[in-house]
């Protein structure tokens, strides 16, 4: 991976592009550090960090990314541990209805799991007590997405549907052998239907004969 200096230079180069095109950015996975940009197996950042001090270089990258995007866009971290070690005192410090969607850095840090259903810990995604519960609470208010990476008993239909509901998944990609398994086992259509937002207009009322220069009133009833 690139050195911290080069990572920050890359982010500065991307900042005007991200700002200019933020309207088509769902969220931004933090990336930049380690193999696959998943913040592990790094040559230039501390490998296997445990303390806030060992996370300091990563935190600087995260702060730069938060600055590179407008306040109404979120940055996704690969594991719940990273948010805790860089910004929080414990896994109990979750977002709430009162602290979500207020433009603060904490309200803009979301989640991505790039080994959904791969094994008991999702290949190191959940390695600490409280980590799962933390993301289950946080993702009520921030994006949750990622990808699958290998076949296991944890990506069968029943556990997959439960995890997607528990963690409020919005988007998912990954190898086709897993989606093929879901299709064979009969849950693919439900997963496809429930991912993300499907806003449907159930009723609509508007000013019947609007005139140029006059106010126009519309009432929409939407269902997700």
Predicted region positions:
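Substrate-binding cleft of extracellular glycoside hydrolase catalytic domains
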Residues: 1-31
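Conserved aromatic-histidine-acidic binding/catalytic patches
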Residues: 2-6, 16, 49-57, 189
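Extracytoplasmic/secreted proteins, especially bacterial periplasmic and envelope-associated proteins
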Residues: 6-9, 13, 57-60, 64, ...
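Catalytic-core regions of glycoside hydrolase
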Residues: 20, 27-38, 42-178
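Catalytic cores of secreted or luminal carbohydrate-active enzymes
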Residues: 155-208
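Structural beta-strand segments of beta-rich domains
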Residues: 214-218
């Amino acid at each position: 991976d690139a050195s911290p200096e080069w990572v920050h230079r890359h982010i500065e180069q991307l900042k005007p592009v991200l700002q200019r095109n933020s309207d088509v950015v769902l969220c931004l996975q933090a990336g930049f550090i380690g193999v696959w940009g998943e913040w592990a197996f790094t040559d230039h950042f501390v490998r296997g960090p445990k303390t806030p001090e060992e996370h300091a270089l990563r935190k600087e990258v995260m702060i730069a990314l938060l600055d590179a995007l407008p306040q109404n866009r979120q940055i996704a971290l690969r594991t719940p541990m990273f948010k805790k070690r860089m910004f929080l005192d414990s896994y109990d410090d979750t977002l709430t209805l009162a602290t979500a969607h207020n433009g603060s850095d904490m309200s803009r840090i979301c989640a991505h799991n790039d080994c959904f259903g791969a094994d008991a810990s999702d290949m190191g995604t959940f390695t600490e007590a409280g980590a799962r519960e933390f993301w289950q609470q946080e993702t009520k208010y921030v994006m949750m997405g990622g990808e699958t990476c290998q076949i296991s008993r944890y990506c069968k239909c029943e556990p997959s549907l439960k995890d997607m509901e528990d963690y409020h998944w919005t988007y998912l990609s990954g190898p086709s052998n897993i989606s093929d398994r879901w299709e064979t086992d009969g849950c693919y259509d439900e997963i496809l239907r429930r991912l993300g937002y499907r806003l449907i207009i159930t009723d609509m009322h508007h000013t019947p004969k609007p005139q140029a220069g006059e106010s126009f009133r519309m009432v929409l009833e939407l269902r997700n």
